[in-house]
Every structure is written in structure tokens, then in C-alpha cells.
Amino acid sequence: MNDMTLYLIIALVPLAGSLIAGLFGNKIGRAGAHTVTILGVAVSAVLSAYVLWGFLNGSRTKFDENVYTWLTMGGLDFSVGFLVDTMTAMMMVVVTGVSLMVHIYTIGYMHDEKVGYQRFFSYISLFTFSMLMLIMSNNFIQLFFGWEAVGLVSYLLIGFYFKRPSATFANLKAFLINRVGDFGFLLGIGLVLAYFGGSLRYQDVFAYLPNVQTATIQLFPGVEWSLITVTCLLLFVGAMGKSAQFPLHVWLPDSMEGPTPISALIHAATMVTAGLFMVSRMSPIYEMSSTALSVIMVIGAITALFMGFLGVIQNDIKRVVAYSTLSQLGYMTVALGASAYSVAMFHVMTHAFFKALLFLAAGSAIIGMHHDQDMRHMGNLKKYMPITWLTMLIGNLSLIGTPFFSGFYSKDSIIEAAKYSTLPGSGFAYFAVLASVFVTAFYAFRQYFMVFHGEEKWRSLPEHHDDHHGEEHHGLGKNDNPHESPLVVTLPLILLAIPSIIIGYVAIEPMLYGDFFKDVIFVNADAHPTMHIMKEEFHGALAMVSHSLHSPVLYLAIAGVLSAWLLYVKLPHLPAKIAQAFRPVYVLFENKYYLDALYFNVFAKGTRALGTFFWKVGDTAIIDNGIVNGSAKLVGAIAAQVRKVQTGFIYTYAAAMVFGVLVLLGMTFWGLFR
């Protein structure tokens, strides 16, 4: 099998499964739908692992070829092609591996759904295909189509429960916010096409960069900026939307309206990292603009810290993990801004495993609670759901950067990158990611203690109905006991827990300080020496653990865990008093810094008001009543006056004729004798 055939199979098999489940779902039934989609994704996952292994043992080399030319227009070729190198192979394994776990998990999670089961499997397989096309693309046009395709599937899955108004509002919100980012992204691609040699293929664009290194572009009369800086910032606007960076982050928490499996696959492990992948892929361009890198670093730092604050007050178990995702995406963005692209991609990989684990473990707890997602109704689930308890504990330990866990190696590397960066804004970024260590540990173990320890709070609740998951689900009754989820749910948790523990230790040296990303990621070490300094300071994975004992990071994490234990296990009455004492801050967090209100009341209502103005004034008053109906009324008015001349009496017409003759004679004599 040649390489082209291999890569086509990896990309297209999930699409085939999606089409079969979507078009023939009623004929093949529920079992047929999940079987065909799981087989398709499993084939992709196995072959992706085979590709990655080939790169690791040196038997495989970089592949960059076009599959076919889709359109030729004015000398410009729009082609479909594959660029498969070590970064692509790593992402292929992450996407297909997590997707496979999610597919298997979905069998148990969606078991009670009466409608839409086949549709759901079709959607998540379609997403897998779309994400593979995005990361395997070798040109901007295919990247953009993959970019839009994953956005479309995200829209469909967030609104999966389309009869629920909150779900339809959430998917529309996600769609519109991402259109803002995509508009900037498209403008950036337009600049690449116009000024970077007239090609959209990555290798051609990178080769042309020396020709535009000092070029400028006029933004306004008298205002010129570096062409590369403007291009980088516009492309990053797209990443801000897709990877949920401040202030385009507001769609991601609401995306929790979709079923939990897609929260794990799309909104934690894969799609939201697409923007980060794009920036890493474009490292040769970004390395030419320190201004763009500074902006990226500051945006990431703001997201990491201030989205973490919002996670502290959440009571929905999935929303805690959602805000955790926002904060971790901010960490990765800080690494990009520090020119530590390999560190960002390393955290993309480790985060994909432990965050998917956290989402799926949260979903397992939700199943045990009969689809009640409110953590205030839980407690002591450790007694009833030991596998869910242990796997969520592992996920949280990795999230907060506990030594020897995967998240420790990648998260601490990001903090080191911010520390050693010399770009403007790096001081703020270092402070923000340090402070976020405490915040992350606090909200992660606040969730853990509320769910798995303490009193069994559902026993003291009145009988209630919770329609958060479909329309026929109820919370636990007072005398009910939760039960551990079935094997089809817990097996993916166990399998995801393994890389959440070991993958960081295994991968840190080759990915960050070895040749794994050689000729894939470009860093200008003279201008941005962060990775060079980090390499000199690195003495092995075990030495990194011992070094952490002398770092504030570990003690900030411990302080966060102890604070959560004190407030939610030992003194559970205290959080309410603290919230009351700091009421203005709590209200600010509760209203999510009022950004939703700003967007709704200013931009949404403002746009509607502007549209209403143009409708009533421009369309109705000027065009309809003025130009169209007004011209008709004017003709009618003139005709009404002319009709008055038509009296029907002969002497009136004779008098008019005599008057006309006299006027003509007068004009004649005037011309003769003047």
C-alpha cells in the first residue's frame, strides 16, 4: 500500500461510516449504526498509530503531495492534498484515538435516547473526518473547508436536542461567534493569497516569506503596518474563535447543552485545539512578528486566569470542566506567544487525554445520578461508583500538574516558557499562569469533593424532574442509590486514564528537546530564545520532578487542593458566607464579566435596531413609500389636476384653443420684432 492510499483510507473511512449511519440508519438499526462508525474510526486509529510509529522508528518521511486539483481559476489552483509529518501524525493519533473512545462510550451514554441515536453516531464520525481533513491539509483552502466543516458539525451536535430552546440558542450562539473569528481568518487567507506569491500551498507561502519580510500594508490613510503582523493577527482572530480565546470564548460554556460525549470529543480534545494547531503550523510566519506573538501571549494569559475564576462558582459538573478547558486553552496560547510551539502541541496532546477523561467521567457521574448535572445534588459517589471516582481523580491530578502525571510535564513547561520569554507582556503572562495554578487546583478539587465526598445530598432533596438530558430523565429519588456505569462507559475511562498518567513522562524529551518536530516547527532562536534556554535547563523527566520541589508551582497547586478540601469537606457552610461577603465579585463572576450581556444588548440588539431602522426608514419610508409608491402618487396627483381641464363643454375647449393660438402668435411676433 503506497502512502497516498494509506492517508486516503485514514481520512475517508470515518466519512463512509458517517454516510452509512446517516443515510441507512433506519435500515441497519442502532447496533448497525454504532458498529459501522466504530469500525471506521478504529481503522483510522490503528492506521494513524502505524503512521506515527513509522515516524518514530525512522522508516517514514514527510509526505506533501496533492491528491487532485479541485478547481483552476485565473492561474490559481485549488487542490486537495495531504501534508503528513510528525505533528500531523501526532494529531491524527489524538483525534482518532479520542474519537474511538468517545464512540464506544456513546453506546452506553445514549442508550436511553429514543430518537436520534443513529444521527448522533453519524455526526461524530463526520466530525472525525472533518478534523482529519483539517490537520492533514497542505494548503489554506483545504484548511478552511475543514475549519468550517468541524464548525458545522459542532453546530449540529450542540443543538442535538433541538426541541430544547436552550440548545438551539447555544448552537446558534456558537455558530455566530465562530463566524466572527472565521471572518478574520478568511481575511488573513486573502492577504496570504494576495501578497505571498499567489499560492495557497504552505510550502510555497513559507518559501516566499523573505520577499515580504519588510513589506507594509496601509490600514487607513497615513497608517501602515507590517504586512506579516497584520496577516498573523487576522489568522489568529480565526484561532480565537475556534479555540475559544477571550473575548470570543463565550460560546464554549454554552456548548455543554450538547450530549456529554461530544463535549469530550469536540469541545475539549480536538476541535478547540484546531486554532492552536494552525498557529503552530504557521510558525515560520509568526516567527517574523514579535508584535503578533506578544498579542497572542497576552490574550492567552487573560483567558487562562480569568476563565479559571469563572470555574470556581459553577455548580453544573460539565460547566466546571468547560471552564477548565477554556483556561487550559489559554495556557496553550501563552506557549504559542512565547514561541514554544512544541510545548503548546505537547500540552494539546496531554490535555486531549486527561480532559476527555474528565468529561467522560463527568458523564458517567451524570448517568449514575439519573442525568442530574447539579453537583449540589451529589456527594459520596465514591462509595457507589469506584471506577468513575478513580478515573476522575486521575484526570484532576493530571489537570492540576501533579508530578509524574502527564499534565505536570506539559503545564510546567508552559509556565517555564512564559518565565523565559523576553517579549512584551511576558511578565503578565507568567504571573497569570502562576496564579491560574492555584485557581485550577481549587475548582478541580472543589468539583471532586462535591461529587465524590461528603453527604449524599440527593437524599435531602424534594422529588424533582431534571430535563437537562432529553425529555424523559429524572434525578435520583431519596431512597435511590447510584450504580457504577456499564463496562461500555467505564472501559474508555480506564483506557484514557493510562495516557493521562504516562504519556507526559514518555513524550517530553523527544517532543520538546529532541528531533520530533525537526523541520516541522520553525523558531527564530536569536529573536525568541525561550526554547533554547529551556533546553539548557532540562536534565530529564525525573530531574524535572525534583526541580518542582523548589518551584512555587507545586505549592500553589497543593494550596488550591487544601483550600477546596477545607471549604467543601471540613467547613461546607463557609463558601456561602464567603460569597455573601464578596457579593460584588461573586455577581461579576456569576454574570461572566457581563460579556454575554454586552454582546446581547449592544451587538445583537444594536444590529437588530440598525436593521429595523433600515427597514422602516430605508426600505419602507424611502423606497416603498417614497420612490415606488411616491412616484405612483405623484403621477396620480398630476393626472387628477389634468382631469379638471376635461370639462366636457365645447366652449371650454374653444376658449383653450383661442388661448393657445394667441400664445403662439405672441411668441412669433416676439421673435420677429425683438
Where are these regions (language model features)?
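Transmembrane helix-loop-helix hairpins at membrane boundaries of multipass inner-membrane proteins
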Residues: 1-6, 24-122, 195-224, 229, ...
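N-terminal signal-anchor/start-transfer transmembrane helix
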Residues: 11-26, 100, 240, 244
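Alpha-helical transmembrane segments and their helix-start/interface "positive-inside/aromatic belt" motifs
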Residues: 30-43, 172-184, 383-392, 483-499, ...
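Hydrophobic alpha-helical membrane-insertion segments
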Residues: 39-56, 181-196, 392-400, 492-514, ...
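Membrane-interfacial helical/loop segments at transmembrane boundaries in membrane proteins
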Residues: 61-76, 201-220, 410-421, 510-544
